[in-house]
Design a protein with these regions (language model features):
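C-terminal transmembrane helical hairpin of 12-TM major facilitator-type secondary transporters
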Residues: 302-347
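Cytoplasmic helix-loop-helix junction between adjacent transmembrane helices
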Residues: 130-168
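Helix-loop-helix hairpin linking two adjacent transmembrane segments in secondary transporters
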Residues: 162-210
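Juxtamembrane intracellular "pre-TM" segments in multi-pass secondary transporters
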Residues: 23-32, 211-242
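Intracellular juxtamembrane helix-capping segments at the cytosolic ends
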Residues: 140-152, 342-355
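Conserved MFS/SLC helix-loop-helix module at the cytosolic interface between two early adjacent transmembrane helices
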Residues: 86-124
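Helix-to-loop junctions at the C-terminal end of transmembrane segments
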Residues: 88-99, 288-301, 385
Length: 421
């Protein structure tokens, strides 16, 4: 888990260079969360995020049922990620202005409706549209991350945020497993049906668990959105974190969205259940990457970001042999998820440090960039897979890793521009 307790409110010059700062709650928000509540928030976050990633293991099933090629069916997964990015940009800033509890409950209802629409979609373009809508309303997990922070005491805040983020990552990866098994047994429409049905107990749990959120700003919605660009423009740590994590997330999704096609074709000829099963392996890697949070506290986020970029790039070097070796595929999955999760933790820590009172807006910028990168990664990698096969995916991942390294090292380490309070 993340351990932000080591990050102090007032930084020494050395720590400022590494971008360390305490994630402070809004002073108006009471710290009321028990560990059991935070754990339930993590479960809710993990359950909702599966709406975005449940499609990936069943893409070959959708392609076969609707008689479309891989490049076209990949748009279903890409639409979900793009919709998620839109939701992050337009809905997440509202958490600084309005009651987050009402936002979360409304979005879960929307997720139920769009998942049901996807299950009943008559054609590929209707499915793409439903997937886009499902993505927009499924940004609930990123509403819960700052919610967990402001509900916790300062000494527990890092653990609370880390618990919710770990729930998100486990939901992403295990959601693929469940999707693969259900899709293999009952067809791809059943996957969306299960997602829709699951939103009912999730809504009930959220309604019972979440307290009323206290706004941290009185800015109008228009001014909230207008304040996003200056945050990115004026603060280099936010800009760099956005770009680097967008590139790493593009790598992450380029692999996962094409894994089912790799396994379905020669030499493996394995079905969607196998593709989903790799989610368990990836979840192990994501849990192991909690060490990255500890390293962020000790060494500062910049050094951990650099290590994460190297790990992700190394993962694609291992995955180059995935067409002929399941062992390399398994190892590559674990290494990839460790690298991406460590990057997510360290980049987000660095961005949040700029202004703790604008966590909703910073999170909106950061996660919008992240999932926009993921959506582009899906679309581009689908074309590469169709044209060049698995080699195209591997080269794509390595190139993105090198670009991320260039962005990260283009600016010399110096005192971070910490928000003046």
């Amino acid at each position: 888990m993340w351990h932000f307790a080591a990050l102090r409110r007032h930084l020494s010059k050395e720590n400022a260079v590494n971008g360390q700062l305490n994630l402070s709650a809004s002073p108006a928000t009471p710290a009321t969360a028990s560990r059991s509540k935070i754990l339930m928030m993590a479960i809710i976050a993990g359950a909702v995020i599966t709406n975005i990633y449940c499609t990936q293991p069943i893409l070959p099933l959708i392609a076969a049922d609707m008689d479309v090629n891989l490049a076209t069916v990949d748009l279903v997964a890409g639409a979900a990620l793009l919709g998620f990015a839109v939701g992050l940009a337009l809905l997440l800033p509202l958490g600084d202005r309005f009651d987050r509890r009402k936002l979360v409950l409304g979005q879960i209802i929307g997720a139920f409706l769009f998942a049901a629409a996807a299950a009943l979609a008559p054609g590929i373009w209707a499915l793409i549209a439903a997937s886009f809508g499902l993505g927009i309303v499924s940004c609930v997990p990123q509403q819960l991350v700052p919610f967990a922070a402001v509900m916790s005491l300062p000494g527990d805040r890092g653990r609370s945020v880390g618990t919710v983020v770990s729930g998100i990552m486990v939901g992403i990866l295990l959601g693929r497993t469940i999707s693969g098994v259900v899709g293999s047994a009952y067809g791809w429409r059943a996957v969306y049906g299960v997602e829709a049905a699951f939103m009912i107990p999730v809504w009930i749990a959220a309604a019972m668990l979440l307290p009323r959120g206290v706004p941290s700003t009185n800015l109008s919605y228009g001014r909230l959105l207008a304040s996003l660009w200056p945050l990115a423009r004026d603060h280099r740590p936010i800009r760099e974190s956005m770009i680097v994590q967008a590139l790493l997330w593009a790598c992450f999704n380029a692999f996962w969205v094409n894994l089912a096609a790799l396994l379905a074709n020669g030499p493996w000829h394995l079905g969607s259940a196998w593709a989903g099963g790799f989610g368990i392996i990836g979840a192990a890697g994501a849990l192991a990457a909690s060490l990255g949070g500890r390293a962020t506290d000790k060494r500062g986020p910049r050094s951990v970001v650099a290590a994460s970029i190297g790990i992700v790039t190394a993962a694609f070097l291992l995955l180059a042999g995935a067409e002929s070796s399941l062992a390399l595929l398994v190892i590559g999955v674990i290494v990839l998820d460790i690298g991406v999760q460590s990057g997510l933790v360290s980049n987000q820590t660095r961005a949040f440090a700029v202004d703790p009172k604008a966590q909703g807006r910073i999170n909106s910028l950061y996660m919008t960039a992240t999932f926009s990168g993921g959506a582009l990664g899906v679309v581009i990698s689908g074309w590469l897979m169709t044209r060049y096969g698995w080699s195209g995916i591997v080269i794509f991942g390595i190139v993105l890793g090198l670009v991320a390294a260039l962005v990260h090292w283009s600016g010399k380490p110096r005192r971070e521009d910490v928000f003046s309070r």
